[in-house]
């Protein structure tokens, strides 16, 4: 008779969860940040709000973003004038777009990751789909499974309405799935488009304007599995993962799905909340490894905005090059919510290879990935690089 312990042992992988491939995708429509204020106030029929437009121009100028990608073109916005008002009932029209476009953009990223992985898609055992856009049943996980032609027995997990910390969440969940299911190969997709959050300006809701200045569209996909085969090429090992709520941070970042779409609220002290709590998260994650020099590890931090990055850098005494990959992705794409940290992983491993550095993590062995978002929730993932 087989024991439960023997069954459990046979079910589990031996090695750590490992990222085996990364793919990204963006909509074709690219917007220039320097001219975006003129476009945004024109398309929302708000040019008469001259003072507010000047504030928005300053927000865009300080954002450190050069361009973003957006599904919403001028043509789509003209067809849906309710999107351009500040608080017009518009959820039905927004939903009609996102339930189609979120899985479609996710499919592009997934196909890129699967191509790099180089294995038949029939080997995918699990799917995790994460989006802050467009709740539906069956969900985007189902739509993606159909679009890619995955096996009907693939085990799916749909994560809606998580927000900007969720790039860390999906890695934490994928790690548990890969390590507890022998031969599991987990396809993780984060697909985010701003169709639900786009709205016209209002003088009483400046934090909404901050979102209009920062958010962009993008999808990222990774393949995660333990015990890589000789045909697979490991990129990063997922060593540990933790989630915590920052103390005294209730209401710091909120999103509410209403008839008018997804409304966004952000307190001014978010950068200080993050920077005041980040060292505790680092210490808890790296003390077991005997690491306390935060410049000795590579960094992947969700780029919520330049103020968060500046305060984290200052609080921890980080050298400017530590957040190079993070700032590069913010500059080239804006804040893509959950997808951002996966874009940064992709940027880091490519730059490390191009620069001839010894590992996928800028030549360093250990690294950290941070997600920050509603709650205020902080996700901390310890990464181990592999030889480049």
Curated annotation (Swiss-Prot):
Its EC number is 2.3.1.74. Pathway: Secondary metabolite biosynthesis; flavonoid biosynthesis. GO terms for molecular function: naringenin-chalcone synthase activity. The keyword Transferase applies. CDD domains: CHS_like (cd00831). One of its GO terms (biological process) is polyketide biosynthetic process. The keyword Heme does not apply. Keywords: Acyltransferase, Flavonoid biosynthesis, Transferase. The active site is at 164. It is an enzyme of class 2 (transferase). PROSITE patterns: CHALCONE_SYNTH. It catalyses: (E)-4-coumaroyl-CoA + 3 malonyl-CoA + 3 H(+) = 2',4,4',6'-tetrahydroxychalcone + 3 CO2 + 4 CoA. It holds the Pfam family Chal_sti_synt_N. SUPFAM superfamilies: Thiolase-like. The primary product of this enzyme is 4,2',4',6'-tetrahydroxychalcone (also termed naringenin-chalcone or chalcone) which can under specific conditions spontaneously isomerize into naringenin. Belongs to the thiolase-like superfamily. Chalcone/stilbene synthases family. This is Chalcone synthase D. It comes from Ipomoea nil (Japanese morning glory).
């Amino acid at each position: 008779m087989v024991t439960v312990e023997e069954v459990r042992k046979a079910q589990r992988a031996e090695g750590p969860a490992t990222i085996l491939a990364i793919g990204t995708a963006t909509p074709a429509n690219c917007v220039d940040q320097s001219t975006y204020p003129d476009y945004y106030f024109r398309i929302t029929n708000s040019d008469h709000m001259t003072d507010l437009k000047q504030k928005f121009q300053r927000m865009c100028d300080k954002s450190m973003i050069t361009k973003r990608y957006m599904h919403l073109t001028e043509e789509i916005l003209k067809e849906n004038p309710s999107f351009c008002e500040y608080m017009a009932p518009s959820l039905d029209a927004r939903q009609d777009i996102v339930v189609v476009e979120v899985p479609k953009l996710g499919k592009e990223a997934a196909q890129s990751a699967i191509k790099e992985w180089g294995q038949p898609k029939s080997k995918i055992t699990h799917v995790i789909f994460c989006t802050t856009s467009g709740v539906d049943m069956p969900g985007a996980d189902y739509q993606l499974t159909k679009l890619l032609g995955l096996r009907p027995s693939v085990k799916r997990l749909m994560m809606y309405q998580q927000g900007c910390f969720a790039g860390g969440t999906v890695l934490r969940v994928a790690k548990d799935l890969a390590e507890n299911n022998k031969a599991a190969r987990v396809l993780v997709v984060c697909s985010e488009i701003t169709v639900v959050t786009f709205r016209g300006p209002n003088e009483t809701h400046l934090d909404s304007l901050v979102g209009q200045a920062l958010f962009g569209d993008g999808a990222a996909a990774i393949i995660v599995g333990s015990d890589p085969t000789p045909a697979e090429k490991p990129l990063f090992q997922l060593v540990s993962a933790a989630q915590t709520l920052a103390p005294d941070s209730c209401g710091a970042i909120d999103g509410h799905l209403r008839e008018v779409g997804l409304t966004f609220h952000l307190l001014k002290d978010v950068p200080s909340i993050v920077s005041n709590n980040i060292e505790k998260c680092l210490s808890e994650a790296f003390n077991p490894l005997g690491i306390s020099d935060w410049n000795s590890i590579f960094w992947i931090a969700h780029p919520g905005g330049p103020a968060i990055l500046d305060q984290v850098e200052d609080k921890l005494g980080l050298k400017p090059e530590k957040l190079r990959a993070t700032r590069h992705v913010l500059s080239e794409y804006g804040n893509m919510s959950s997808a951002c940290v996966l874009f940064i992983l992709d940027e880091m491993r490519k730059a490390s290879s191009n620069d001839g550095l010894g590992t996928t993590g800028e030549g360093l062995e250990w690294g950290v990935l941070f997600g920050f978002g509603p709650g205020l929730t902080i996700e901390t993932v310890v990464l181990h690089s592999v030889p480049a």
